[in-house]
Amino acid sequence: MNPGLRLACVAVFLFCLAIAIAAQTPPQAAHEYTAAHRAELVQQFSGLLSIPNVAADPANLQRNADLLVAELRKRGIDSRLLSFPGAPSVVFGHIDVPGAQHTIVFYAHYDGQPVTPSEWDGGSPFTAVVREINTEQRIYARSAGDDKAAIFAQLTALDALKTAGIALRANLRFVWEGEEEAGSPHLEQILSANRELVHGDVWLVCDGPVDQSGQQTVVFGARGDAHLEITVYGPHHGLHSGHYGNWAPNPAMMLAQLLADMKDIDGRVLVPHFYDGIEPLSGSEKEALARAPVNDRMLMNAFWLGHVDGAGAHLLELINQPSLNINGLSSGQTGARATNVIPPTATADLDLRLVVGIDWREQQQRVIDYIRSRGYFVVDHEPAQQILQEHPRVAMVLRDEASYNAVRTPMDLPIAREVIEAVKSARKDVVLLPTMGGSVPLGAMERAAQTRTITVPIANYDDNQHAANENLRLQNLWDGVETMAALLDMK
């Protein structure tokens, strides 16, 4: 070939290559980046997962925060720790883009639920292990799905965009919390003290699982959460069940009867006024629910359930109603430690999930009023002998003051439509939901940062969130990087 012609062909090839690279969409850039670096990325993610992150270990929580600040700075992002006495630090990073019209805030959390190593396969929750399950690769470790995956996906998406030469178009903020699993008791105070830093046009809350169908999900609200701890009393100390059975009241039985009367056979709560005040869904929200996949039968098979509550209503409908759940019961002993005894006390922890229109304090009070209506004298501290002997039934009810209300962002806001289009550019089929089943302190975020919140999760629904053998499908991680790249590219 003529040297001049060869040179011209090379020039044309390079020009076309440059055009192709320039035409790359953010999700395409993320896909190519993760495909080229998968082994390295899994190793890096494993390193992040190796640092313990439970509330009882503040030194390691600080290690997590310091590492994340370093990761942001390594990418040229101005970052710092936002601190409050007695609370884990919030990791904050910001990118300002000249001429940008909007500011987008990405929220995630780096803390995790407590662990019991003996319940984990291999016995080590902080040693990440990749296993193949039904031809899918999953990485197992505490916070693999909830919520270090979101942080790692954001960092990786930033790397992918930089590698592809795709310039950012909006101001970006990163807010990564360290006590979400403890109920975020200090988040609002930290954000309020730094309002000028954390304000944005929208907060993208990157937490939770995608739809059970596996489709990417965008959620516009979250249930609120309130807790009550109920203790009922019998004898001052355990009594021999043969000598005193049929005579001494058994608090375990008393509590079981009290709790059983709170619901009917279909699971509907019978506490008076429990459903009062619910703000109805809008027309667009009802339409979104009607289009969402119905996964009930699949979930029944996955969870080995022979029946479900709800009187025939689908799970997605029931998520938009308040609920009453028993988190745990405690009285006496079972198994090899069981004794023939009438226990002195019985305790239950109640979890009240809330929807928009119901205040958490009012919902707690409705349950307390119901307990009174069943003949109990209610106290908020350990009762003395006089109280126990003056009243036939005594219940100590402790309110969790770290509770919070539900929040819902309208789906038809301009910023909401922009988020939907960005996510669709990465994932095509997207499930839109008015409310997620879980609870996130969105109200604290919206009040303190004076903003709106939209949740974009990336974890698989069966990630064993909050339990032993927590895991993340690696494909969810790669898909999540593409989704984050699309959101980081918003203008």
Task: Tell me the role of every PLM-derived stretch.
Residues 24-25, 211, 227-471, 475, ...:
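Metal-dependent amide/peptide-bond hydrolase catalytic core
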Residues 44, 54-102, 125-128, 422:
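A non-catalytic alpha/beta surface segment that caps or lines the substrate-entry region
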Residues 8-20:
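Bacterial N-terminal signal peptides
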Residues 25-59, 66:
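N-terminal capping segment at the start of a domain
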Residues 166-248:
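Histidine/acidic-residue-rich, glycine-tolerant segments that coordinate divalent metal ions
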Residues 101-176, 479:
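Active-site metal-coordination/substrate-binding segment of hydrolases
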Residues 54-56, 86, 99, 110-114, ...:
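Solvent-exposed loop/turn segments at secondary-structure junctions
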Residues 46, 50-54, 73-77, 159, ...:
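Sec-exported extracytoplasmic/periplasmic mature domains
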